[in-house]
Amino acid sequence: MDFDLMVLRKRLANRGFQAFVCSDIKEAIDLITKSLLNKNDSVVGIGNSMSIRELELTNFLSSKTVYERNLTGSNEDERKALHADIYFTSANAISYDGQIINIDGTGNRVAATCFGPKHVVFVIGKNKIAESLEKAIERVQNTAVLMNLQSIT
C-alpha cells in the first residue's frame, strides 16, 4: 500500500509530534545534523536500532558525548542515555493514523522515549507504516521482532 506521507505527517502533528519527511538517507542525515541536532546538545543517546545504524549517525557526532550500547556493550550507557540532551531511536511500526508502536527487549528505548530526554527523534522508514493499529501490531509481531532477533544473533 502506498501511503501519503504528508497525511501521516499531519496526523502525527495532531498527536503532538513534529514530523519531517525526507526523500532519502542523505536528506535525513542533513536534517538531523543541520536542523535537529542543536549545538547545545552535548550528550546524545542512541537506541539500538537498525534504522539508526543505517544512517551511520555516530560518524557525525564526534564533538558530542554519545551513549549507545552498541558501541560499548554497556548497560550503564543505556542508563546514561536516559539523561541525554537528545535521543535518537526508531519504532517497530507506525499506524497510518499516527500511533507509534515499540516493543523493546530490555525497555531502554521505550523508557527513553517516554520518560527520558527532552528531545526524542524517531527515524521511521516507509517500510514501517501500516494501514491501522492492528496491522502495525501485526507487523511488530511478525516482522520487527524476527528482524531484531536476527540482528542480535
Each language-model region and where it sits:
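N-terminal active-site beta-alpha-beta segment that forms phosphate/nucleotide-binding
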Residues: 2-88
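Conserved phosphate- and dinucleotide-binding cores of soluble alpha/beta proteins
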Residues: 82-153
